[in-house]
Each structure stands twice: as C-alpha cells, then as structure tokens.
C-alpha cells in the first residue's frame, strides 16, 4: 500500500489526531470544506475517522470508516485489517473479479458475492462509495473498509498477510 497516498479524515473535537505516519491528516474541525469530499463518497461525520487511500492520479483504492485509532494506524501504514466478513461486488465477465476471488480462496477467507449487473442497489452503493466510478471488483470488509479493484499484492496486505503465497515455478536446467 506504500504506493498509495493516504488521507485520514478526523474531527479534532471528537477524535485524537492520527499519528503523522498515517499520511495526510485532514481535521474537519479546522477545514470544514473537506467534508464535501467525504460527502461525495457517501460519508458523513458519523463515519469518522475515515481513511481514504488513492493512486497518485486520485483514483480511490481504499476507504475505511468508523475505525478505531489502532485500525486507522494499521490500515494507513499498510498493515492490513482484521475482518469477520468479506463481500465481493463483481460482474460475471470481469477477469479482475476472478483474480480477487482466487486470492480470497487462497487465503481461506470466506466471502459472499454480489453481481452488480444483477443487483441495482449494489451497483448504486459501489458508485457512491467509489466516488462515482463503477469499479469491479469492489470488496467490502465488515461494512467499514472498501477496496476498489485491488491488485493481488494489495489485497493480500488488506487480508493482513493471511493469503498463501503460491511458489513461482522454477525453470529446470537442461542437462
């Protein structure tokens, strides 16, 4: 997750400031205008503290809400999360969805699946949380952390290292 830019939104009148290693800290008490960015993701002050991790071009990859101070630090510093449930929002035609499900299976992480081509409410929710993009796969962890088309290494980190790494095939030398 080190290639992602991390923004931690909090309200200093209700939460302590996150540690500096968490990245860009945005205090809504000091910068009320920042609430507009959260509103575009369907988030409000009730969802704070919130972690938003983006690509350098601004594409949102991870959103975490209602996190404890420890969870905020772990997620923001790339140490993954502990979750009890995972839901994969996918489409049947999507190769990235199949890859994400394979990583979850390798990690022995049980998950439910929702096809957003068949479930309009799920599609609307993905659009809302991703800032208006129809991103598949979208993964929801315990209804508090969302990952948008995470590459396998990022997904493994989110799973807190639970994914089993498959050994790479080695080329045998011809004798």
Language-model region placement:
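Local sequence-structure signature of Cys/Sec-based thiol-disulfide redox active-site neighborhoods
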Residues: 1-25, 79-112
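Thioredoxin-like thiol-disulfide oxidoreductase module
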Residues: 26-47, 115-134, 140, 159, ...
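Secondary-structure transition/capping residues
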Residues: 49, 82-83, 137, 166
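Non-catalytic, surface beta->alpha helical segment in thiol-disulfide oxidoreductase systems
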Residues: 54-80, 141-175
């Amino acid at each position: 997750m080190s290639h992602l830019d991390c923004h931690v939104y909090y309200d200093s009148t209700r939460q302590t400031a996150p540690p500096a290693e968490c990245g860009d800290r945005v205090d809504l008490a000091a910068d009320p205008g920042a609430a507009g960015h959260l509103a575009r993701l369907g988030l409000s002050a009730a969802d704070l503290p919130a972690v938003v991790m983006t690509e350098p071009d601004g594409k949102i990859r991870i959103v975490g809400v209602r996190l404890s101070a420890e969870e905020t630090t772990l997620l923001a510093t790339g140490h993954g999360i502990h979750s009890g449930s995972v839901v994969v929002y996918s489409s049947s035609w999507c190769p990235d969805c199949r890859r994400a499900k394979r990583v979850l299976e390798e990690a022995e992480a049980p998950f439910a699946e929702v096809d957003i081509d068949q479930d309009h409410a799920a599609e609307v929710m993905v659009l809302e949380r991703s800032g208006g993009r129809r991103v598949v796969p979208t993964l929801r962890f315990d209804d508090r952390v969302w990952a948008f088309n995470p590459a396998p290494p990022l997904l493994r980190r989110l799973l807190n290292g639970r994914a089993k790494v498959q050994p790479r095939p080695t080329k045998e030398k011809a004798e």
